[in-house]
Amino acid sequence: MESSNQPNVLIFDSGVGGLSVFQEINKRLPEVNYYYLFDNQAYPYGELSQETLLARVEALVVKMTQQFAIDLVVIACNTASTIVLPTLRAKLPIPVVGVVPAIKPASLLANRAVGLIATPATVTRQYTHDLIRDFAHEKEVELLGSTRLVDIAEEKLRGRQVDQQELAMILKPMKHKVDVAVLGCTHFPLLKEEIQQVLGDEIILVDSGEAIARRVQSLLHQLSPQSTKTPWRIFSTAQPWDEAALNGSLKTMGFNAIELYPL
């Protein structure tokens, strides 16, 4: 397989949450050339206006797809996916895959109620409420928006211990109320073990990672990639905090050290 051409896949997020999506795709497609770009200069995306977010993502993704002959883009951020997909799909001649909270599969699994754990931006966005209306209208749905959970995931990837007591306080509104919980932000599967511990083993945790990986696999089968095998590269738009610790985690995933890629 080494001698044959391999597709170049770009995974994009505002932070390191998209690495949970990368891990799912990589399980199925370990031979792919991966490029990961995170726009930490504008993190967290939930606090940006839609116009600013769209302008940043479009500029960064278009530039990188041209520079590295990317075959497929994954927007591994729920907030960005709800805003940028139509524009990117119109601009780029390659497939663009987005993420949406896994409300549909969760509602099929739930007997009692579905919980959506996401960022405040995702919880309040009309897009999310449309998903609930379309796929979970027969179930009770509990919404929990937290920015702090995103930060905890970022800290964990830099080797910080997760404070289970703090996690329990954040997740308290969800406990004993639902039988299925959707991890509606790509950062949250990085905390899956800890969240499971807090909510209890009887709660089923659902995220979009596996579905995205299947979609990417299906799309790549239809392409004729031109690139040879290259090292996996990761880029940030600003100097990341605690870069050495983060690079340590990234190395275990197979990435080279972080490179600066300013807007």
Swiss-Prot record:
EC number(s) recorded for this UniProt protein: 5.1.1.3
Superkingdom classification of source: Bacteria
Classification via InterPro entries: Asp/Glu/hydantoin_racemase, Asp/Glu_race, Asp/Glu_racemase_AS_1, Glu_race
Residues the record lists as binding substrate: D13, S14, Y45, G46, N78, T79, T186, H187
A GO BP annotation: peptidoglycan biosynthetic process
Keywords on record: Cell shape, Cell wall biogenesis/degradation, Isomerase, Peptidoglycan synthesis
MF-aspect GO terms: glutamate racemase activity
Pfam family, one: Asp_Glu_race
Pathway(s) served: Cell wall biogenesis; peptidoglycan biosynthesis
Catalytic activity: L-glutamate = D-glutamate
Family annotation (SUPFAM superfamilies): Aspartate/glutamate racemase
Residues annotated as the enzyme's active site: C77, C185
Function recorded in the entry: Provides the (R)-glutamate required for cell wall biosynthesis.
Family (UniProt): Belongs to the aspartate/glutamate racemases family.
PANTHER family: GLUTAMATE RACEMASE
UniProt name for this protein: Glutamate racemase
